[in-house]
Amino acid sequence: MRTPNILLASQSPRRRELLALLAIPFTAVRVDTPEQFECAASLEENVRRIAEEKAREARRLYPEESSSSIILSADTVVEHDGLILQKPQGEEEALAMLQSLQGRTHSVHTGYALLYGERKHTAMATTRVTFNAMPKREIMRYIATGSPFDKAGAYGIQDPVMASYVSGIEGCYYNVVGLPLSAVWAAIQKMVV
């Protein structure tokens, strides 16, 4: 069976690049939904809920496009020492996040949601990443690029400066970039059967 068009509810250029790797037709649309964590819910419940809220908002905002498409959305966070690191709000927060990750292992969690007609699938993928120690001058140089400010945990593993300090990865690399491709592709295949 032919895979329907994907309606990607994301402003992330990285998610668009990743989805393009699957060589399936997709359209990216903008949705603005709050990415607020509920204290009473688990991390997994939160990222799955946020992803589903984005997908439902895309369905509401783009009814014509979504009527025959699979809607895909995601939410990525970094977890380190029991803290949730989302997108930093400024240089100081980016510096604190990046310094806390140096020489240590953290987890990257991506909740994703797929809506297709009445069908729904939500899940979460987790990848563990270990960084070598990074000198403060390198961290400041990276922050000066502006790259940390639209990324959970204040870094992009694919960014050349950061990639040179990754000493280990356990799980899906693409999950750290923003979308666990193999898990998403498997879920899409199940939806269209």
Swiss-Prot record:
Its cofactor is a divalent metal cation. One of its GO terms (molecular function) is UTP diphosphatase activity. Its EC number is 3.6.1.9. Keywords: Cytoplasm, Hydrolase, Nucleotide metabolism. The keyword Cell membrane does not apply. It is found in: Cytoplasm. The active site is at D75 (proton acceptor). The record marks R14, T76, Q158 as: Important for substrate specificity. It catalyses: dTTP + H2O = dTMP + diphosphate + H(+); UTP + H2O = UMP + diphosphate + H(+). GO terms for biological process: nucleotide metabolic process. Belongs to the Maf family. YhdE subfamily. HAMAP family: Maf (MF_00528). Nucleoside triphosphate pyrophosphatase that hydrolyzes dTTP and UTP. May have a dual role in cell division arrest and in preventing the incorporation of modified nucleotides into cellular nucleic acids. This is dTTP/UTP pyrophosphatase. It comes from Chlorobium luteolum (strain DSM 273 / BCRC 81028 / 2530). The lineage of its organism: Bacteria, Pseudomonadati, Chlorobiota, Chlorobiia, Chlorobiales.
